[in-house]
């Protein structure tokens, strides 16, 4: 028996019949914990525990959770834990694929009808062989590669962190180029909690993805300059 928490996406037709399902614990790596260990533990579950605000979780604590039978909306790794926390699903009709936003992996991920990952828009840290090759390469406006390491990138490019609403902008996209808008909440940005909570910020961001070259360019962002006053750890718009 396998316990699951929001790690199966089910496609249902207008008559309520199941057409297909995407079992994320088989498609992705439910043991990638790089992001989960850096999240604010006061803002990871449906039942928010304010007493844990500002705290992170250790590898030992994650391992202990895996030994427990207390399944439910509990952050952690492994099938049955809240390791994916998918909060949006969009559809790309050009190749019959879905685009998911996985909050607890801090990644937008495109998955084909064949259940294979097409690309991953997120920090490369922690992705094992088979997934690492699918992580998009950031580039600047001239197409030159941008160096990224330990969750941080050179220049103005940034990944999204604990994001929501990764949506394809249909009127600007085609089969080769996908324009993606994302609400970047920003918790665990750069795979760490800042020294001061007031350093956190939320932003809206638009990316241009070249699906043939497997590159991503950041086209636009708003919110970074507004700072912590507009930071939203859980909510999206």
Positions of predicted regions on the chain:
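Asp-box/WD-like beta-propeller blade repeats and closely related beta-sheet repeat scaffolds
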Residues: 1-43
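Beta-propeller blade signature
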Residues: 3-15, 196-211
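Beta-propeller domains
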Residues: 28, 55-200
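Conserved blade-ending motifs and adjacent loop-strand segments that build the rim/top face
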Residues: 217-233
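Conserved small/polar residues in nucleotide/adenosyl-binding loops
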Residues: 235-237
């Amino acid at each position: 028996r396998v316990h699951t928490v929001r790690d199966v996406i089910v496609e249902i037709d207008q008559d309520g019949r199941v057409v297909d399902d995407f079992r994320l614990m088989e498609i992705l790596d439910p043991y990638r914990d790089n992001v989960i260990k850096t999240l604010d533990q006061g803002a990871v579950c449906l039942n928010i525990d304010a007493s844990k605000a500002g705290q992170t979780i250790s590898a030992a604590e994650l391992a202990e959770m895996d030994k427990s039978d207390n399944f439910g909306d509990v952050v952690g790794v492994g099938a049955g834990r809240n390791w994916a926390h998918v909060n949006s699903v969009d559809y790309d009709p050009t190749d019959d694929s879905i685009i998911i936003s996985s909050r607890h992996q801090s990644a937008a991920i495109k998955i084909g009808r064949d259940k294979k990952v097409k690309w991953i828009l997120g920090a490369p840290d922690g992705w094992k062989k088979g997934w690492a090759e699918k992580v998009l390469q950031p580039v600047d406006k001239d197409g030159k590669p941008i160096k990224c390491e330990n969750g941080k990138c050179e220049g103005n490019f940034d990944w999204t962190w604990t994001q929501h609403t990764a949506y394809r902008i249909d009127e600007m996209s085609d089969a080769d180029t996908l324009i993606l808008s994302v609400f970047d909440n920003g918790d665990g940005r750069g795979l760490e909690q800042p020294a001061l909570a007031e350093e956190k910020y939320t932003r809206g961001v638009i990316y241009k993805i070249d699906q043939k070259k497997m590159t991503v360019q950041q086209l636009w962002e708003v919110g970074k300059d507004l700072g912590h006053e507009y930071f939203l750890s859980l909510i999206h718009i």
